Amino acid sequence: MGIQFQEGKQFDVIALGRACIDLNAAEYNRPMEETRSFTKYVGGSPANIAIGSAKLGLKVGFVGKIPDDQHGRFISSYMREAGVDTSQLVIDREGHKAGLTFTEILSPEECSILMYREKAADLYLSPDEIDAGYVRSAKVLLISGTALAQSPSREAALKAVSLAKAAGTKVVFELDYRPYTWSSREETSVYYTLLAGMAHIVIGTREEYDIMEGASASGNEQTAKMLFAKEPELVVIKHGVDGSYAYLPSGETFRAGVYKTNVLKTFGAGDSYASAFLYGLLRGYDIDQALRFGSASASIVVSKHSSSEAMPTLSEIKALVEEQHV
């Protein structure tokens, strides 16, 4: 049995958080110091998830803040053309810029990112820029962990969560840990713990949960038990090549393996996983089926150059799931 969502809402998913610029190395197998050409894409975990969800046919909205410049216009235009409602994409008028992420692809196993997040526009989304009616109009409100990293974005995210819960909207917390934005792991732990306890569904890697717990070696069952003492109804813990696990308060556990693919790079997998997993839940899939859907989507994205543009179609995911049984 899957998660139950309130019907009669305008949107399936509204994502809140960062929409920024990814500059992915166009030259493979060389360090960033020697890389001279990059390809520009829209990036940022919640933006990627929104784009991926829209590509799968969900009705998707986005809440965020972008700069009043060429990068901001590129982000807004791309997301709109991808099928995401951008009516709540606020334009920053105070000179803040888009976050920039450069990627390095040394090999399929060795990829890295370099982020520039100082005074990024998305972190200046304020509580008074949250439209209550808009937030209430979704079956799911997805919050990215990076939105909690600084004020006023932190307070805006928490306001949106309160509004959503009061309206029967399910809150999904995608941990999305990016050390460049936080002042310390201790600060991250405080705010992750706060929002994870308020969310209905929590999704993250084992390493991200360890940061939240301030632990170096916690077990999945311990993590799930801790969260089920609060409000979560479903906890998803990803273990990279070892697959992903989902836990219910009833004690039921589900697992999906990893689909074989020709890996080009490692980034983007989590965002594609989340969009396809949520698609499955919203379409009434059983949890184990939704896990496989997320895993298949992640495998497709890591075989391609971008994150946002590589988000797969429904037919691509279904074909891979039918081809391989994991």
Swiss-Prot record:
Q: In which pathway does it act?
A: Polyol metabolism; myo-inositol degradation into acetyl-CoA; acetyl-CoA from myo-inositol: step 5/7
Q: Kindly state which reaction or reactions the protein catalyses.
A: 5-dehydro-2-deoxy-D-gluconate + ATP = 6-phospho-5-dehydro-2-deoxy-D-gluconate + ADP + H(+)
The EC number(s) this enzyme carries: 2.7.1.92
Q: Which controlled-vocabulary keywords does the entry list?
A: ATP-binding, Kinase, Nucleotide-binding, Transferase
User: Do the record's keywords include ATP-binding?
Assistant: yes
A Pfam family of the record is PfkB
Offer one example of a GO biological process linked to this entry.
inositol catabolic process
Q: Please give the SUPFAM superfamilies that the UniProt record associates with this protein.
A: Ribokinase-like
InterPro entries in alphabetical order: Carboh/pur_kinase_PfkB_CS (IPR002173), DKG_kinase_firmi (IPR022841), Myo_inos_IolC (IPR030830), Myo_inos_IolC-like_sf (IPR023314), PfkB_Carbo_kinase (IPR050306), PfkB_dom (IPR011611), Ribokinase-like (IPR029056)
Q: What GO molecular-function term can you cite, just one?
A: ATP binding
Q: Does the keyword Cell cycle apply?
A: no
NCBIfam families tied to this protein: myo_inos_iolC_N
The cross-references to PANTHER family, in alphabetical order and at most eight, read:
5-DEHYDRO-2-DEOXYGLUCONOKINASE, HEXOKINASE FAMILY MEMBER
Name the family the entry cites.
Answer: Belongs to the carbohydrate kinase PfkB family.
Q: In its UniProt entry, what is this protein called?
A: 5-dehydro-2-deoxygluconokinase
Q: What organism does this protein naturally occur in?
A: Shouchella clausii (strain KSM-K16)
